[in-house]
Regions:
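Short, charge/polar-rich alpha-helical segments
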Residues: 1-13, 28, 35
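Non-transmembrane amphipathic alpha-helical segments
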Residues: 11-25, 43, 47-50
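Short intrinsically disordered terminal tails
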Residues: 1-3, 52-56
Length: 56
């Protein structure tokens, strides 16, 4: 169970880190913004799966 807790904490940190990076993307760099949004969506999906598994 400790491994899942560690993995969950790391996933939460990764989501927060990507959210912060997305906030400071230059307005003229749409390609970077799209890439960060896709990565953030994937990280959020992974976080949701980990939370569901952790609660089970």
């Amino acid at each position: 169970m400790n491994m899942i807790d560690l993995e969950l904490t790391r996933a939460e940190h990764e989501v927060k880190e990507l959210e912060a990076r997305l906030r400071v993307v230059p307005m003229n760099d749409a390609q970077l913004a799209r890439a960060l949004e896709r990565a953030l969506a994937a990280k959020r999906a992974r976080l949701a799966r980990l939370k569901a598994r952790h609660q089970a």
